């Protein structure tokens, strides 16, 4: 299956997925992007590694921006800390020349993806049920890191 066909399939799957299914797909995309970035790093394809790493970072940032602190403040706060930590770890791992750390970071997302799969299975959206209202997608913003943790040299 070509890239465009696979992309179209994923877009169509996301369009018809339940809200929980969309979260599962987001985690799958993060894991896939980090694994691909790791393979690219191992092959010395640093531009591809950077593109895949940026893709993972964008998805993590989007998930964080969509957290609803009013509905579930405890869970939202914990996920926010997790996402912030993972963004930092992704950037740190991306600075390395091998894919080992990127693979390790991708492994942190697997238990969350699997937990959301259980939620999706145990509490499916009934057929024909209206989707919950979508919150507007916030614009992606640069990631803020403490000054002592900023990577000053991004050369591969």
Language model segments and positions:
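Short, solvent-exposed, charged loop/turn and helix-capping segments
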Residues: 62-77
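Amphipathic, charged alpha-helical scaffolds that flank and support histidine-based chemistry
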Residues: 90-106
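Amphipathic, well-ordered alpha-helical segments in soluble domains
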Residues: 26-33, 52-59, 82-85, 89, ...
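Soluble N-terminal interaction domains of secretory/endomembrane membrane proteins
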Residues: 9-13, 29-32, 38-39, 58, ...
